[in-house]
Regions:
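Hydrophobic/aromatic residues located in beta-strands of well-ordered beta-sheets
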Residues: 9, 50-52, 132-133
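Short aromatic/basic micro-patch
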Residues: 28, 108, 151-152, 183, ...
């Protein structure tokens, strides 16, 4: 049983953006690079530490300019990004009781939502050492919610996160341990939306303008 939650965050920024055509994390969104919205969403005292893991020197430069810790690497797999990020956090903060993983391309995710997820995670950790939390939102056309990132893992999963199968991410553990997965539902499904293509980015920008 955890008495005090100390949670880190790995910002996943190692993708090649093949469908986007260029590095989407540097694409402008509502006045600043897309990745900066992930910085804002995770700028909360509920996180003990965070780190961006990337293969892009340009992303590395942006992180340094914004004062966000960053790790530059050249390894190909999603498992590599998870392992490198978590290892870097644990090297500085071995006391971590949980780690959140967030892709850098969800610009509508709000800090209040991240705080809500972290609070729910910490409350549940008081009762069990092995728990996974993810975000969900109403699907609109069925009983099952949309689910997405970020995803939080308690430290009972750290050994497996550090040894994921080649090319696989943390979703492997969600499928392996479905009874340990909790979904924190939010009202706005667009917070889960990512931007794999320029059209998807433009659609989210239009939504921002529409909501004012």
């Amino acid at each position: 049983m955890q008495m005090h939650a100390s949670t880190g965050c790995v910002l996943m920024a190692s993708g090649l953006s093949t469908r986007f055509g260029s590095n989407k994390l540097l694409a402008p969104f509502d006045g600043q690079p897309l990745l900066c919205w992930a910085f804002a969403a995770t700028d909360t005292p509920q996180l003990s530490a965070r780190i961006v893991v990337t293969r892009s020197a340009q992303v590395q430069a942006l992180c340094k300019a914004q004062g966000v810790p960053v790790l530059l690497h050249a390894l190909p797999g999603r498992n590599d990004t998870v392992r490198l990020g978590l290892s870097a956090l644990l090297a500085q903060h071995p006391e971590l009781t949980g780690c959140m993983f967030l892709p850098g391309d969800q610009p509508l995710l709000r800090r209040a939502t991240v705080d809500q997820l972290l609070t729910a995670f910490a409350q549940t950790q008081k009762e069990t050492e092995r728990v996974i939390f993810r975000l969900g939102a109403p699907a609109g056309n069925g009983p099952d919610p949309l689910v997405g990132s970020p995803v939080l893992f308690s430290n009972g999963f750290f050994p497996e996160l550090l040894t994921l199968p080649e090319g696989k991410g943390g979703s492997v553990l969600l499928h392996k341990y479905p009874t340990l997965v909790h979904t924190a539902c939010i009202a706005q499904p667009e917070e889960l939306a990512d931007t794999d293509t320029p059209a998807a980015l433009a659609q989210l920008e239009a939504l921002v303008r529409e909501k004012g």
